[in-house]
Amino acid sequence: HTDVNNLINSLSKPRTILLMVPSGKATKDVIEKIKDLLDEGDLVIDGGNSFYLDSEENGLALEQKKIKFMGMGVSGGEEGARNGPAIMVGYKNKISEDLKNTLSAISAKTDQDCIGFYEGYGSGHFIKMVHNGIEYAEMQLIAEIYEILRRSKKTNEEIANFFDNLKEENRSSYLIEITSKILRQKKDEVYVLDEIKPFASNKGTGKLTVETSLNLKVPTPSIYAAYDARVQSNNKNDWEEINIESEVTSEIDLSNCLYFGRVASMIQGLELIAKHMVNIDFGIVLNNWMGGCIIRSNLLKELNVVSSASKDFLGDLKL
């Protein structure tokens, strides 16, 4: 279909419309364009990377016309598209079993479906936003470990071996595993990584996580530092003048720094979720992220064990 009217009219009622368009104005424009073409009881699912407050606003706008809405966060990238992503669903109206089954079938699989259902139009996108903030933090931790090893004159192969060894220690993650592959990638016998300028842009979710944490008065220093590092990387005058060699005294210390830095980042993200979503079941969130998504790792399994056995999950993690 090339005409929206024809597309809407071709669907059987009650209609289900899944939007996968850029967040912000584009999503709002599409919803505004189709809402008068829809009928009471139809459902709009926003599967984009929308800010959670936008999802709440869009849901309320459609609610006035008695049209249902779900804000659905999706994580997984290209691999998720092929093998199933982690899906974070925010809802207010009751979800039919058929739709639950369809979304669950699409989602990534571990020993269960990597999908979570959270009450509130913006809740699914809130969980996805925090996921992205944690992702920023872990990527920055990996970058800083790389920086230390590089300045201690380790080769790309040696650094890749360091990250590979974390898998044997059950301290690896999807991001760590692909870092090893990136470090070894060559083109015309030259390491690709060595040809890349150290600039890092962002899509806005890291910034939104930081702003939300400030608004909710929840400290997220690891996530903030990661976002700040991206901003600073675009200031050419800063990074060009830095040229300091270092010496690694213990790779065990670096392994511990990376591991506990990741634990701290995860705790910060979960505390932000807890502040916004009272009585949240962390087991659902951790299982939701266990497969398909960018931050999947053994750490999530470890935290899930603690969560299932603890009455004060976050408190116990801080001990």
List where the protein language model places each region.
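Short, surface-exposed loop/turn motifs that are enriched in glycine and acidic residues
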Residues: 135, 255-263, 288-293
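Metal- and O2-centered redox machinery and metal/ROS homeostasis
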Residues: 56, 194-200, 308-312, 316
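Beta-strand segments within the central parallel beta-sheet cores of soluble alpha/beta enzyme folds
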Residues: 158-165, 223-228, 282-284
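Rossmann-fold dinucleotide-binding core
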Residues: 27-31, 43-45, 51-160, 169-195, ...
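Small-residue-rich helix-loop
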Residues: 165-166, 170, 277-309
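A conserved active-site cap/scaffold subdomain adjacent to cofactor or substrate pockets
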Residues: 191-263
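Conserved N-terminal Rossmann-fold NAD(P) cofactor-binding segment
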Residues: 1-38, 57-67
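Long, amphipathic alpha-helical stalk/connector segments used for oligomerization, subunit docking
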Residues: 272-275
